[in-house]
Amino acid sequence: MTARLIDGRQVAQQVHEEVRQAVERHTAQGRRAPGLAVVLVGENPASQVYVRNKRRTCEALGIESRSHDLPADTPQSVLLDLIDALNADPAVDGILVQLPLPAHFDTETVIERIDPAKDVDGFHPYNVGRLAVRLPTLRPCTPYGVMRLLDSTGEVYKGRNAVVVGASNIVGRPMALELMLAGATVTVCHRFTTDTAEHVARADIVVVAVGRPDLVPGEWIKPGATVIDVGMNRLEDGRLVGDVSFAAAAERAAWITPVPGGVGPMTVAMLMKNTIQSYESRLGR
């Protein structure tokens, strides 16, 4: 069996078009464009690339991107004051603080300072809690994007066994919630799990989000499974690879995401989707 690729770039373009059309519909009626404030603290090269991509996507879709670049030694109080100002700004519909922050910041304190209605990353505990009880919310972007990728396959995942490898607040835990709410039977493997291979071997859906190259060998994959590789790791030779041994896994899976070009584009696309959702909620329509 050779897996079919789930093309994240193609699905992301579909989401972009939905957002672009929504923005055009509103601005054609004389309304302001949606506004996204992007806050970058420090000069982490990877973060700079991610932020540049987000700002470029905003521009392409008609969303006004507001840049706030702060030096790495910025006191936490200054960042919190900036967030307060953005919370109060009626022209700002979404606030994104690029992670990771420098070591002297308390990340949870920063995230919780963002108005949940403007938390377009979907990281605020209020929004994750609403997701858990099936209430409308701004959903965490990467898991939200994964669900859109799964939908694109046309497969039915209700009642299937799903395994999430990784239990981070940003991906693993909300990913498990998304899959459970979609009707899958979900197992989460984390650093204390001793039999990850056995769990993966039984899974119809495998989502891996740890950040370790070749963490999941291809031979672990159940024939016919769907494999979503969230990991993005740069090797010494400059290549980007995921957490799954791609070539071997693709010989067994029915569907698989590539790295790059799989989940990555979807994270940015769903950020834009959340921004237009926040904007429309704030318009009251």
Curated annotation (Swiss-Prot):
Pathway this chain belongs to: One-carbon metabolism; tetrahydrofolate interconversion
Entry keyword annotation includes Hydrolase: yes
UniProt-listed Enzyme Commission number(s): 1.5.1.5, 3.5.4.9
One matching Pfam family: THF_DHG_CYH
Residues where NADP(+) binds: G166, A167, S168
Sequence intervals crossing the membrane: none
GO biological process: L-histidine biosynthetic process; methionine biosynthetic process; purine nucleotide biosynthetic process; tetrahydrofolate interconversion
Keyword entries, A-Z: Amino-acid biosynthesis, Histidine biosynthesis, Hydrolase, Methionine biosynthesis, Multifunctional enzyme, NADP, One-carbon metabolism, Oxidoreductase, Purine biosynthesis
Reaction catalysis annotation: (6R)-5,10-methylene-5,6,7,8-tetrahydrofolate + NADP(+) = (6R)-5,10-methenyltetrahydrofolate + NADPH; (6R)-5,10-methenyltetrahydrofolate + H2O = (6R)-10-formyltetrahydrofolate + H(+)
Gene Ontology terms for molecular function: methenyltetrahydrofolate cyclohydrolase activity; methylenetetrahydrofolate dehydrogenase (NADP+) activity
Tagged with keyword NADP: yes
Signal peptide start and end residues: none
Any one annotated GO CC term: cytosol
Record InterPro entries: Aminoacid_DH-like_N_sf, NAD(P)-bd_dom_sf, THF_DH/CycHdrlase, THF_DH/CycHdrlase_cat_dom, THF_DH/CycHdrlase_CS, THF_DH/CycHdrlase_NAD-bd_dom
Subunit structure: Homodimer.
Function of the molecule: Catalyzes the oxidation of 5,10-methylenetetrahydrofolate to 5,10-methenyltetrahydrofolate and then the hydrolysis of 5,10-methenyltetrahydrofolate to 10-formyltetrahydrofolate.
Stated family: Belongs to the tetrahydrofolate dehydrogenase/cyclohydrolase family.
Record protein name field: Bifunctional protein FolD
Species this chain originates from: Thioalkalivibrio sulfidiphilus (strain HL-EbGR7)
Gene: folD
